[in-house]
Amino acid sequence: MSFERDLLRRMFDAAINAAQPAHCLPPHLPAPPRGRLVVIGAGKASAAMARAVEDHWQGALSGIVVTRYGYGVPCERIEIVEAAHPVPDAAGLAAAKRIRDVVSGLSAEDTVLCLISGGGSSLLALPLDGITLEDKQ
């Protein structure tokens, strides 16, 4: 491999590594709340971001994120739901309703950490009244 090609490869690898949620998310976590920390989110990287939060958050937390089928990662305190992307499906609709229900029950002392990445719009398909999931598909 040429010097230039090797340099470009190392730069590319460094950029990919720097963008990994486990590296870039922890410094930006919020201060511990007086109430609960509830994590919600959607997108192809949301499960990896949720895992990074779990790995670096010392206090209690809970939540739910929705990611693309096959993109889930093991989490203990944050539920990971998989749904269709780019065409929304019933799993994404159900996850969006559950996220809405979770945040509806929060108090002023609770903190919501919302993890959004690419694909979130199809993974959180909760149409307004009069619009069906089939319309969104």
Report each predicted region and the residues it spans.
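Non-transmembrane, aqueous-exposed alpha-helical and coiled segments at domain scale
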Residues: 1-117, 121-137
